[in-house]
């Protein structure tokens, strides 16, 4: 039985070696998701617009929520919330689909020689496309209400990259576990819902009592959400020490997830 390398070098080499295949599969995934609908891929633009409008109405008008900055601006709360939600949605879309990544492509396991490790990258690429659209909607709304965004917005890719590494590590692990344990998909759905409310998306960290703030510090999404808001809305530079720690931690998770996937993939065909 073939042995699959689990080295850090192979994790990078596999992506580079299969980049054209990954790109083609991402395109197929994005277009296929909207195939048959009346307005097609335009839904990818309309969805974040509707989402931003709904959150603005519900939280700023119905609940009259404010972010704790002393400002009464309804659009400020909506844009701060939406910036955090953009980061969370990247995580939720990839991780939510990860347990079925192999199960949905059984033919790749049984009938052809296929680099299965790229399937989580396909989910990531499709999610990044939707994220890019959402950032565009956020940017348009910010420009209308607050003017030209700060140059710190250019640092957003540096904030997103460690989140991508973290998500990929989790996705590789879940893609493998989903083959052997079919209940993983159901469990992950619950975890994602819990994380949504346990992340500083709908409220600032300072809104929690001191004794509960520690819970958010153990949430791996908190640094990404907070730093994204800093560079997107608050016109601040991210804390370099926090960013470096996030990079290192995310790299460890990515390497462990990839190693687990490579070590367990030999049994996929037997289970499927």
Feature locations, PLM:
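Hydrophobic transmembrane alpha-helices and immediately adjacent juxtamembrane helices
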Residues: 1-272
